[in-house]
């Protein structure tokens, strides 16, 4: 049960729904509210399909590359640490001020904003680490995906409630939690490496 909770938190932090809120709103601002909801749901379903694909194929890719669990854990910790640093100290061009009169399809909402390289790499690493607990991983992925959908569908409410500064503060807080999780993953990998 604790594995499901920690994995769900990890995936939500990497999906970064709060960080993606302003970008989603900028890209979809020219659409009416009803159409915006349809586009968000469609893009999130596409992202889910891509994420599930990487979750189930990830282990096979790692076997082909002949990577050990310790390597996966250490590199996963480093990747997540870098993501967390970007969340705490976002750069100006990180905001991807994309504005288009066209309706987005697949890019940039589903990929790379939700199912980005960091999330797909993490899913591959998790599928290798928890090979015999795939049911829990799928459950964690679905819970975190659903949570992200709810936040993105309630984007205007969240921005009204917290304001852009409040959303930024929450994202930085999520970054701090992700730093702790990534450090733990890194240390677990080092410990396992020394044991072997």
Curated annotation (Swiss-Prot):
One of its GO terms (cellular component) is plasma membrane. InterPro entries: Multi_antbiot-R_MarC (IPR002771). Keywords: Cell membrane, Membrane, Transmembrane, Transmembrane helix. The chain crosses the membrane at residues 8-28, 45-65, 71-91, 105-125, 134-154, 174-194. It holds the Pfam family MarC. It is a multi-pass membrane protein. The keyword Zinc does not apply. It is found in: Cell membrane. Belongs to the UPF0056 (MarC) family. PANTHER family: UPF0056 INNER MEMBRANE PROTEIN YHGN (PTHR33508:SF10), UPF0056 MEMBRANE PROTEIN YHCE (PTHR33508). NCBIfam families: PRK10739.1. This is UPF0056 membrane protein BU449.
